[in-house]
């Protein structure tokens, strides 16, 4: 039918990482805890394996009465954005070999000294630092993909006005998530209405303050509906008024620094299982 058109497409991406990350053998002897509570091991030189990100999609356009007055259009498919490789670079730069630090709770251990070399090590052995942050990535991590569907109708009205109603829904296929693999199980809960979890300690491995780990989730979503009236003119100008409302929820708003993303994520319970919350991209009206 001339007034009904379908389109289909298939895209695929294969992110690949060279074997450039440094190995810290000491980390391989440590046990960590993933977001499901299971004990796991990591290697600092193990980056995500290459995997195919399939992105099929279909679309349609239907001129209902074949007179360009009433048009239904829409489509559905999986979409892959441009990979943000900085997420992976966190692991390359935070492995306990390149840099290290000392976190002291007792300020009398190293009192203030204006000399910047006062506490600088006299020798650097090349072995892991006495204390170091880790940024890790789950071996089966996949870059973000969303399944997005939209439907819309355009209707020509008297006086040359075009009315449009549209709805878009997106859900995570491979959404981003972070958890601290060095955070132990909560030991108790508060009493009363505020029954949040409590921790008696914040490290499984004492020399690793945090091991923020990049992983995936598939619970985030967003939707938006809009309605507009538009009056185009022959000289190329147009007048348009529109209203839209939407909602966006995810488990974390990813940033370029793994630790900062995990620490700055507002939660009310277990920080390794934050649950859905409004995204910073939540547009509302």
Language-model features and meaning:
Residues 1-2, 10, 58-62, 151-155, ...:
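Residues on the lipid-exposed face of transmembrane beta-strands in outer-membrane beta-barrel proteins
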Residues 2, 70, 119, 268-270, ...:
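Exposed boundary/loop context
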Residues 2-6, 68-72, 159-161, 233-237:
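Outer-envelope beta-barrel architecture signal
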Residues 10-14, 24-29, 245, 258:
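Active/binding-pocket-proximal capping segment
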Residues 14-15, 79:
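Solvent-exposed loop/turn segments at secondary-structure junctions
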Residues 15, 164-285:
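Gram-negative outer-membrane beta-barrel transporters
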Residues 18:
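Short Gly/Thr/Asp-enriched flexible loops that form oxyanion-binding sites at enzyme active sites
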Residues 21-213:
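Solvent-exposed loop/turn elements at secondary-structure boundaries
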């Amino acid at each position: 039918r001339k007034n009904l058109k379908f389109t289909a497409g298939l895209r695929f991406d294969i992110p690949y990482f060279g074997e450039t990350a440094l190995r810290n053998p000491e980390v391989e002897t440590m046990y960590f805890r993933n977001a499901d509570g299971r004990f796991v091991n990591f290697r600092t030189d193990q980056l995500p394996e290459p995997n195919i990100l399939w992105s099929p999609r279909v679309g349609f356009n239907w001129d209902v009465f074949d007179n360009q007055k009433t048009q239904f259009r829409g489509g559905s498919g999986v979409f892959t954005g441009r990979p943000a490789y900085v997420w992976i670079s966190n692991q390359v730069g935070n492995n306990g070999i390149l840099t290290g630090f000392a976190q002291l709770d007792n300020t009398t251990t190293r009192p203030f000294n204006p000399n910047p070399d006062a506490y600088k090590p006299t020798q650097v052995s090349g072995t892991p630092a006495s204390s170091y942050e880790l940024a890790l990535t789950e071996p089966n991590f996949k870059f973000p993909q969303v399944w997005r569907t939209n439907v819309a109708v355009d209707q020509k009205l008297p006086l040359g006005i075009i009315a449009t109603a549209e709805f878009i829904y997106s859900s995570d296929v491979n959404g981003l998530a972070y958890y601290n693999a060095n955070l132990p199980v909560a030991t108790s809960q508060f009493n009363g209405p505020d029954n949040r979890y409590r921790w008696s300690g914040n490290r499984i491995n004492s020399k690793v303050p945090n091991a923020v780990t990049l992983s995936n989730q598939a619970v985030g979503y967003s939707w938006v509906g809009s309605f507009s009236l538009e009056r185009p003119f022959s000289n190329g100008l147009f007048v348009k008024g529109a209203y839209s409302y939407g909602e966006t929820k995810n488990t974390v708003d990813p940033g370029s620094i793994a630790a900062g993303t995990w620490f700055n994520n507002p939660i009310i319970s277990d920080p390794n299982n934050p649950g859905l919350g409004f995204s910073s991209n939540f547009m509302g009206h």
